[in-house]
Amino acid sequence: MGEGLGGASTCLLVATAGAIVSYIPIGALAAKIGRKRTIQCGIVLLAACFMLGYVLTTTYSSIQPIMYVVFALVGLAWAAINVNSLPMVVEMCRGSGLGKFTGYYYAFSMAAQVVTPIVAGSLMRAIDYRVLFPYAALFVALSFVTMCFVKHGDAKAEAKKGLEAFEDMDN
């Protein structure tokens, strides 16, 4: 796109701001619809944003205001995934297994953060920088497939007691 690192940094800043603003509302949403569903919604939104990012970066030669909206949505989608992932791992573990599974979670997360810049960078060097968004969308879509196999990890709603049990009767 010819924007250089400044334009890319601004897009990353917008995505980070979108995530920060979304963390608490995403937690509340997950309490209503479940962590798994929230993560899956985040994955779908993230893949769509990456594909839209591809279309926008191949259509325009400079950063357009719509791209900032897309990157803010990237942040929201990332928050939906990030806020709920570790709590799902913790919810699935029993006592002594918690450390082991937390270790797996972080080992695989960090391994992906080390490997993907190498693979994506090699693809961008061999093909073009435009391969980055489809590459990201592909792996986000693959993460959706893995989430379809998750059967545990959603918090169980606790039964309300006393007067709290009558709060939702008006709705």
Describe each region flagged by the PLM.
Residues 1-17, 65-66:
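Loop-to-transmembrane helix entry
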Residues 5-6, 93-105:
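Loop-to-transmembrane helix entry/capping segments in MFS-fold secondary transporters
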Residues 21-35, 124:
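Helix-to-loop junctions at the C-terminal end of transmembrane segments
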Residues 32-44:
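Cytoplasmic membrane-interface "Motif A"-like loop-to-helix N-cap segments
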Residues 45-61:
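C-terminal ends and interior cores of transmembrane alpha-helices
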Residues 80-94:
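Intracellular juxtamembrane helix-capping segments at the cytosolic ends
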Residues 122-140:
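A membrane-interface helix-boundary motif in multi-pass transporters
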Residues 136-170:
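Multi-pass alpha-helical transporter architecture, strongest
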